Design a protein with these regions (language model features):
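Conserved Class I S-adenosyl-L-methionine
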Residues: 196-282
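Short alpha-helix
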Residues: 176-191, 197
Length: 282
């Protein structure tokens, strides 16, 4: 049990201030240009396991409208629209929105999805995109926008950019994220009653040769891990196997490579949902 003093300290702590200090110490946040460069890798031509789990937890009512803030290329917006929900899909990356437009046209969802070029400074909703400098500000905007239910997802172990199994195997250091703890406590201080559910989404990285695999995975070797490149090459050489689905579209629509690693990369997410507490909503 938590005694009275500890409980009072938890409730009075400046969780958002501490969050902002942590963000200031992190590497530079990715801007729209960085996400523009990644857009070519996002081609959501099928509903990924993450999207299916997210939609199940979101538990929307039939035809309920959704604001998807940080929509990217539409990994959530497209399946939501296919399920009959009107979606306002907002992102600050023009290239991501261009990829979303292609998906909208491909599936004939022009009457279901409304793309908007917006950043967190404009309006708020989030699936995997709530990690901003001012977390309380983002959560407050989301709370004020939603009429019935708010939901965010945040990483509950290592960043999706990293393969935790591989990094541990080669002795590379990695910092696991606990941002969802800050979000939960900030929401409590806002007067909300957040519910947290954890789920995992699998990821399978594929490549066409050993050197291509090393080049791909070496992006994970940063923040002092650059000297682990030889260990990385040895690990991939020992654990690369034939990909039985080589050439087929992957979860992002890009053709899969000839090889893959002999383990599935898993990302753990914290799904946080709550009823809006802001007053003055219609």
């Amino acid at each position: 049990m938590v005694d009275g003093d500890a409980r009072a300290e938890l409730l009075s702590a400046d969780w958002n201030g501490e969050w902002m200090r942590l963000q200031a110490a992190r590497r530079r946040a990715d801007d729209s240009f960085e996400w523009d460069k990644r857009a070519r890798h996002f081609r959501p031509l099928e509903t990924a396991p993450y999207a299916r789990d997210f939609m199940k937890l979101l538990a929307l009512k039939p035809s309920e409208s959704v604001l998807d803030m940080g929509c990217g290329a539409g990994s959530i917006a497209i399946p939501l629209a296919q399920a009959g929900h009107p979606v306002i899909a907002a992102d600050f990356s023009p290239s991501m929105l261009g990829t979303l437009d292609a998906g909208i046209e491909y599936y004939g969802l022009e009457d279901r999805i409304t793309p908007l070029e917006l950043a967190w400074d404009d309006v708020a909703f989030a699936s995997r995109s709530v990690t901003t400098t001012n977390l309380k500000g983002a959560l407050t905007k989301l709370d004020r926008t939603a009429r019935r239910r708010c939901a965010v997802t945040m990483v509950a172990n290592s960043s999706p950019r990293y393969d935790l199994h591989l990094m541990n195997a080669i002795g590379a250091s990695i910092t696991c994220s606990n941002g969802f703890v800050y979000a939960f406590n900030i929401l409590i201080q806002m007067g909300a009653l957040p519910q947290v559910t954890y789920f995992e989404s699998p990821r399978r990285d594929t490549f066409d040769s050993l050197e291509a695999g090393v080049a791909d995975f070496s992006r994970m070797l940063e923040h002092g891990n650059e000297d682990k490149i030889d260990r990385l090459r040895d690990y991939i050489a020992q654990h690369m196997i034939e990909n039985p689905h080589a050439g087929e579209p992957g979860s992002k629509g890009v053709p899969q490579g000839r090889y893959m690693l002999d383990h599935v990369r898993k990302v753990r997410w914290a799904f946080i949902a709550w009823e809006p507490v802001s007053s003055g909503r219609p």
